[in-house]
Amino acid sequence: MDPELLPRVLLPEEEEQQDRRSYRHSFYGLLLTLLALGLCSLTGVALQSGWSPGSLRLVDEILTESKPLWQARLLSSWQAGVEGSAVEGPAAAAAEAGLATEAEPAKSAAAAAVVEADHAAVASEDPRCSEIGKKILKSGGNAVDAGIATVLCMGVVNPMASGIGGGAFILIRAPNGSAEFIDCRETAPAAAHQDMFEGHEEDIRNGGLSVGVPGEIAGLYLAWQRHSRLTWRDLVTPAADMAESGFHVAAYLANSIATYNATILSDPGLSAVFAPGGKLLKKGDTCYRPALAAILKAIAEKGPDVFYRGERARALVKEIQAMGGILTEQDLESFQAQVREVLLGKAFGLDFLMAPPPSSGGAVILQVLKILQGYELPLASAGVLGLHRVVESLKHAFALRMHLGDPAFVNMTDVIQDMLSDEFAARLRSSIHDNITFPPEHYGHPEDESEEDKKRHPHRHQLYAQLDDHGTSHTCVVDQDRMAVSITSTVNGPWGAGRMAVQSGIVLNNEMADFSLPDRPGRIPMPFEPPPAPANFIRAGKRPLSSMAPAIVLQDGQLKAVVGGAGGTVIISAVLQVILHFFCQGYSPFKAIDAPRIHHQFIVQDLDGPATAALKDLDGPAGAALQKLDGRASAGQKRDSAAAVPSRGPGRKLIGAQEAAKLATTEPNFPPPLFGRLTAVSDPRKDGGPAGY
């Protein structure tokens, strides 16, 4: 039967009020996020490039309200399998930053986003940083060397997303097939506790109290100690030189400066660098970061002890405490990066090397893939029915996600076993109905679960509020020996804590915002709002749950892809869909990254993004298409009209321009022998640019 003709079951009229609330969980509500289309940027290394000039202007047209044209193109894109791409529209902040408001020609954008290489390749969010990584590779360095140098560069040119004031996840696969995961995520200071923000919850996102103990330098140094070929100085010096000599402000940084101008102008450290003389830097201006250059040079010569101990550490702590923070010298000195076992999984005939907790990304992606592999292709992910199945699978996985946390503090054995189990995935798949969706309590457990199973696995029936993290940068590297590295680094929110340590030029993280806070006494939750997750409550020395999801994909023991992303919770859905696009739908590498994506994280409270206004007036062909998609709405729920889009409600979030993912793949049977050719892809919507040779 045509899935679009499947019947909808109507609830009794007297249940209309409940029905309207259930509407918030409907697939229709989610699919409106398709209007975000290409706003989520991606980069990577792939087999071949491709581009679709007809859809590159789509979001630009949405934002300029060319409704008849964009509606027709949107409907056409859906019917064609949505293989196009989209660029960011002329937002006011972008215009103020001096950004172009017209889309670049599709062919030149695609050409800048793709590099084919026989030996080694780097995909990052800035072509200058990718070039640094390439130079490291050509000078005899391996993928770890190139990854370290590239990530440090990203912290210089994209400080709103990452830097040495934050943390990172590093996934490494050696040429001999061994793999490891280095966790250098920020930790809560020793004086931290779960009630530390009670009465002033706003401080969890801004200021000194939101700062966790930075871990990036410790993690990069540990990776260097375990895997490097070159000297530490060789890897740190390029970023130090760039910070000292200055660099041109790219469009992405200019946009962020304009968007967060109040944050920058209100902080002496940030304003001195990014608004000298009170004038915000714009695209093409030269930015100088001498204080950061000085500490990077010291780190290059003397190693991470310069950062974590001694005079510079004391100065950093003093500044953070002056901002209201509780971080101490002992917190810095005691930080340790952790080597963890890689999370392993199989789906669609592929082997996945994923990030383990405190990342939630690896487990969620693996569970969704295991659910979807039980469907026949392409309806596991393509078309209206495929999208519905992806969404329902995401809802099941996100329902279990908030039981995860720092393994040093949380016993997650049963949860991880569920999320990696083929049998459990099959039972969840059987609870997905192709014509309806359900209220939240339906998800996270099989539909046919017995009372005995409910008692044995209570986590399946306890729903918790979702962590909604932000920001980050990602880098993928594959070298000539096919060592693969996938690194996600972050200061969490845009511009982290909104503070810069003046003496060191370090943008400070606000990683404490990634913890869950207990409910305030007397607070009345919103409808369908679950309680916060105890597994992610603040504890001294604890790492908060993360959405970062660096991944490496193998087929028959051979490296096939290196994938990762940036952008908070949308990392999970973005990386998932890049994998589905490339391996299951046969997209070219460029299209796999550039194609529109949807996002669902089970329960969220806000609908954000530059295309929000466009969602409120949805008529014509696109509206009709959404009505068909809405045929899988909650049993009996009623739809006011295709134009009725609440600005708040569970289960929807527009994908923003900050997101990025990377794909690195090898093509078998192509010279050099045994390894295959590399194609690096970086999404031009985030100023990304790959490099290789």
Predicted regions: what they are:
Residues 2, 15-26, 41-89, 98-135, ...:
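Noncatalytic scaffold domains of N-terminal-nucleophile
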